[in-house]
Every structure is written in C-alpha cells, then in structure tokens.
C-alpha cells in the first residue's frame, strides 16, 4: 500500500458535438488504500475539431469574479447542480472561491462550469456544476463586455 493508489478508474462522456466543436467530460477516480473514500476529478475539455486547439471559456462567457457566480446562483440566474444533475442549493458557509475555467458544453447554447468535490459542497454532492443558460450567458457578457 505505502501511499500508492489502490484503485484507479477513468471514463468519459461526450456532452456535445457538431461539425466544428467537441465537448468531453473526463473523470478520473482514485482510491488510496486506507482512505475513508475514493476521490475523483472531472475535467471538461472543449476542442475546435478543425484546428485541434482547446477553446477557452472566455470565448463563450465573460465572468469577472467568483462573487458574480455566487450571486447568480443565489438569485436563480444560474442553476446549481450536484452529481447526477440533481438541483442543489449552495449551502451556508460554502462560497464560490474562484471562477472555474473547467467547463463543458451542454448543447442548446448552455455551458456548465465544473467544480470538484468539496469545492462548492460536501462530498455527498460529488462534483458540482454551475449551469449558464443562453440568457445567463448573454447577461454575463453584457455585464462584463
């Protein structure tokens, strides 16, 4: 055991694809022997299929600071989900500490920001996701032009 991973799994999901863009969620799970539970990390990858280049979040939405995300969640402009796409609440004493550049395309013009376990909620929430609808994207882009 000696601090080595006991088990590692990886999977992916294509969340959106068209002629120019592909969006993938890549999840890696690891369990270290003796740990109370395993841990996982989910990464959103959005690529231009023509150039092969990653597409940064700011090409889609401009977010000035983490407080904008937190206010958006609390006001209902943005949707907040736990693992399994279950609607969740941002619990008291949990704050958005940074603007994640880890994102994926959901289709129909929506974008999801990805946060890892414990970043925006307890472990039972798993990964958490902040969804920007097309209207929310337009609102943020007007605000942060």
Predicted regions and their residues:
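Compositionally biased intrinsically disordered regions enriched in Thr/Gly
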Residues: 1-145
